[in-house]
């Protein structure tokens, strides 16, 4: 996130919605932010070498996505998917770190998180559709319009929910996890009911609050399933 803020500092400054972010507002300098980024990358490298060789081999791929995704909105409306893949690396990396393997369940979790993230990022990007279009930036809302963008978001979330169901079927996780998935799916449905092409006033509730709740629900029910 810090790297994204540095890379997008000029864009954030020019966009009225994001001009108040820390770097364009002068609350923190690029040098200070870059120092934090370098420390974070160093910690990532040290951590990977403390785990297993698969984690070490995959480390360059993780770094590539962490750097590359911030540039994607400059040339493709699939930037939301690249962000999703980048965020999806987190649970995939956790799996590799814990097991030293890559199995079907890991890929299902990876893509479930990727499409969930892509979906809510599309919803969030509806706020900047006009600015992005004028600035020559790419996004699904700026390319296809708000109404179709929300359809993309729904499709991404249907894919995510389906992959979570597949993960349940393919793994040893039990009914507690399944209940968590069903609750998460219901929250996704509610999330989409909060926004429409005619009313984006609740975008922040849909983006921040609902997805925060989904994260907590999945964490609690997954841990609960493993403990029971």
Q: What label would you give each PLM region?
A:
Residues 9-59, 134-179:
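Multi-pass membrane catalytic core of lipid/isoprenoid biosynthesis enzymes
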């Amino acid at each position: 996130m810090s790297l994204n803020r540095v890379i997008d500092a000029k864009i954030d400054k020019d966009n009225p919605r994001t001009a108040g972010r820390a770097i364009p507002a002068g609350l923190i300098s690029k040098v200070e932010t870059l120092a934090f980024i370098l420390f974070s990358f160093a910690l990532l490298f040290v951590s990977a070498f403390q785990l297993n060789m698969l984690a070490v081999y995959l480390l360059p791929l993780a770094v590539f996505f962490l750097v590359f995704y911030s540039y994607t909105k400059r040339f493709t409306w699939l930037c939301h998917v690249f962000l999703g893949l980048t965020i999806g690396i987190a649970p995939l990396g956790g799996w590799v770190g814990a097991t030293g393997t890559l199995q079907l369940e890991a890929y299902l979790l990876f893509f479930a998180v990727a499409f969930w993230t892509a979906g809510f990022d599309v919803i969030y990007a509806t706020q900047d559709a006009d600015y992005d279009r004028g600035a020559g930036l790419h996004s699904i809302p700026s390319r296809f319009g708000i109404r179709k963008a929300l359809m993309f978001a729904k499709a991404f979330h249907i894919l995510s929910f389906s992959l979570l169901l597949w993960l349940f079927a393919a793994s040893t996780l039990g009914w507690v996890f399944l209940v968590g998935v069903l609750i998460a799916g219901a929250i996704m449905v509610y999330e989409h009911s909060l926004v429409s092409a005619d009313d984006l006033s609740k975008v922040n509730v849909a983006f921040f609050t609902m997805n925060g709740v989904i994260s907590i629900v999945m964490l609690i029910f997954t841990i609960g399933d493993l403990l029971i």
